[in-house]
């Protein structure tokens, strides 16, 4: 195959022999010390991304026969949550990396799977995505893919919200075949080197949260896509959605990862608030107590936070195990399998979103006015959850669950459902 980015990053030989969750916790402990400062600065988390590269975790889901960790989905989800607890931006970046790589297996060929998985594992490649566009609606894609005589394409246009594209080695991109081609209107997917001539990830990401995710735009100017870099036939993803084939698992995978990013952030907010309440919060004088930790209303709040997380965590872990069961069915996947998984994941997404938003804003009630000082950075938890939770309206996830409960309907397969 032609896809061989110039950057080579040799993977630690014994990485896959370690416990990935323990590795993630070690990294999280290191990053937690600089999270507030880095959030304030914004920009790129270059050093932290290199930490992840050196850890070998970028090949977490790569099968062992290709040199990866060979982790299952429940383990991968746990790693995402650990990272997000320390830094929402890094949890976001790593989560997106985990949604990108499975596309190789979901719609690519056996040859592409072997080649790309091996390269990711051996060279510790970061993957980035270039799918969304900032047009009239979410699927109004204008990046054009012009077919070439050799079976490849040439891409032109601009993608937006390209999380992780900057600093990545392998870029997953979608384009629409131009109107004067026999394939007109078809959506093509490809995995290309980010260093390919004509690919320009831009430094134009600006939002109230997720400030170190490099989620800005990426320009494509006469970018050549080689024939063996095209994943599946034109409209492979669309057909997978229509027929509830294995490729349609992209949506529940992505949504479950997003939910666990939120849960990780909620855990991070709760842990940080608890430490502050124990060590710095002042008791309310009329309460007649000596320590803030004795306040009955504060105690109740921490109980409510914890209970909300217990329920959401349990649902998320149950969904991760169901994902593994469905994933293992391979091509024997049925529409019912896919539908049951998506309903479960939709419920988790709603639980996680509500818990994370409530906890990340509610912690201010238990830390008090002094805790709002910027040096503590408590606001970053809410800003991160609020920013990413707008990715797709959670109300539609709740409606999907309701339609199934009331009418036995499964969500219509798509990029977010």
Swiss-Prot record:
Q: Write down the Pfam families for this protein, in alphabetical order.
A: Acyl-CoA_dh_2, Acyl-CoA_dh_M, Acyl-CoA_dh_N
- List the catalysed reactions: dibenzothiophene + 2 FMNH2 + 2 O2 = dibenzothiophene 5,5-dioxide + 2 FMN + 2 H2O + 2 H(+); dibenzothiophene + FMNH2 + O2 = dibenzothiophene 5-oxide + FMN + H2O + H(+); dibenzothiophene 5-oxide + FMNH2 + O2 = dibenzothiophene 5,5-dioxide + FMN + H2O + H(+)
- Relay the pH-dependence remark from the record: Optimum pH is 8.0.
Q: Which InterPro entries match?
A: Acyl-CoA_DH_C (IPR013107), Acyl-CoA_Oxase/DH_mid-dom (IPR006091), Acyl-CoA_Oxase/DH_mid-dom_sf (IPR046373), AcylCo_DH-like_C (IPR036250), AcylCoA_DH/ox_N (IPR013786), AcylCoA_DH/ox_N_sf (IPR037069), AcylCoA_DH/oxidase_NM_dom_sf (IPR009100), DszC (IPR049992)
For region Central beta-barrel N-terminus, the annotated ranges are 125-233
Its chief place of residence is cytoplasm
Q: What is its EC number?
A: 1.14.14.21
- Residue ranges annotated as coiled coil are none
- Entry keyword Nucleotide-binding: yes
What is the regulatory mechanism acting on its activity?
Answer: DBT degradation completely inhibited by Cu(2+), Mn(2+), p-chloromercuribenzoic acid, 2,2-bipyridyl, 1,10-phenanthroline, and strongly inhibited by Zn(2+), 5,5'- Dithiobis(2-nitrobenzoic acid) and 8-quinolinol.
Q: What parts of the sequence cross the membrane? A: none
Q: Which UniProt keywords apply?
A: Cytoplasm, Flavoprotein, FMN, Monooxygenase, Nucleotide-binding, Oxidoreductase
Q: What class of enzyme is it?
A: oxidoreductase
Region Helical C-terminus: start-end pairs: 234-417
User: Where does the record say this protein resides?
Assistant: Cytoplasm
- Asked if the Swiss-Prot or TrEMBL record annotates the protein with the keyword Oxidoreductase, the reply is yes
Q: Name one GO biological process term.
A: dibenzothiophene catabolic process
What PANTHER family does the annotation carry?
ACYL-COA DEHYDROGENASE, ISOVALERYL-COA DEHYDROGENASE, MITOCHONDRIAL-RELATED
Which family, according to UniProt? Belongs to the DszC flavin monooxygenase family.
Other known facts: Reduced flavin is provided by flavin reductase DszD.
Q: Tell me, in a sentence or two, what this protein's role is.
A: Catalyzes the first step of the '4S' desulfurization pathway that removes covalently bound sulfur from dibenzothiophene (DBT) without breaking carbon-carbon bonds. Sulfur dioxygenase which converts DBT to DBT-sulfone (DBTO2 or DBT 5,5-dioxide) in a stepwise manner. Also acts on thioxanthen-9-one and 4,6-dimethyl DBT and 2,8-dimethyl DBT.
What does the UniProt entry state concerning the protein's domains? Has 3 domains, the helical N-terminus (residues 18-124), a beta-barrel central domain (125-233) and a helical C-terminus (234-417). The lid loop (residues 131-142) change conformation when FMN is bound and close the FMN-binding site. Other regions that probably contribute to FMN binding are residues 178-184 and 281-291.
Q: What is this protein called?
A: Dibenzothiophene monooxygenase
- The gene that this protein is the product of is dszC
